[in-house]
């Protein structure tokens, strides 16, 4: 008997170097190792690149694509939808250090999630799913977390911080498939857009 959750993966890692590193992974699984089960198998492709042209400067980029044909989504009460799911995630960062006094960090995490071809189901008292006649809309989720942080050492144990943050989450009931357009939505209509300056002294 197969376990409720199972899967396998193939990984390729580049040589460990200070200048350049890369990581590739393909994963096929049903459910999560320490999470909920799922109706079917999902495919997850991940690639990550690290580039450090100088000792005090590093660039990092990660991209992941997850696909699942029978993604189960709870809507309300005992009403569920089964969708074709795609999730595209991009994480980019830049870290720079100017001696002992200056530190600049930039990080952006963007998620584009699409749920298409929805089918409606209801569950009975023992958890079985039964297909019903109902209308469910496909939807698109956009998520952004962007931050730039600068730190300056004024005196020993005294620091100036300048932080800019922007982001949010937007859900639209549409079939937009352009990753560029999906990523742009929370940037153009942010739920958070803050600029902070503070001084901290450690006693």
Regions found by a protein language model. Name each.
Residues 1-203:
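Exposed, low-structure sequence patches enriched in small/polar residues
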């Amino acid at each position: 008997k197969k376990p409720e959750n199972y899967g396998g993966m193939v990984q390729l890692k580049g040589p460990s170097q200070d200048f350049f590193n890369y990581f590739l992974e393909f994963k096929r699984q049903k459910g999560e190792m320490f999470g909920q089960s799922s109706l079917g198998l999902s495919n997850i492709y991940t690639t990550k690149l690290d580039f450090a042209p100088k000792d005090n400067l590093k660039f990092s980029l990660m991209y992941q694509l997850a696909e699942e044909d029978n993604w189960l989504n709870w809507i309300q009460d005992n009403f569920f939808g089964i969708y074709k799911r795609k999730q595209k995630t991009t994480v980019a960062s830049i870290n720079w250090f100017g001696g002992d006094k200056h530190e600049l960090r930039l990080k952006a995490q963007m998620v584009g999630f699409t749920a298409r071809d929805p089918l409606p189901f209801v569950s009975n008292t023992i958890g079985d799913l039964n297909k019903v006649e109902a209308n469910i809309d496909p939807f698109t989720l956009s998520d952004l977390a962007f931050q730039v942080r600068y730190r300056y050492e004024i005196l020993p144990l005294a620091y100036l911080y300048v932080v800019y943050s922007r982001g949010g989450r937007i859900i639209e009931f549409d079939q937009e498939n352009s990753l560029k357009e999906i990523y742009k939505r929370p940037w153009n209509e942010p739920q958070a857009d803050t600029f902070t300056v503070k001084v901290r002294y450690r006693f």
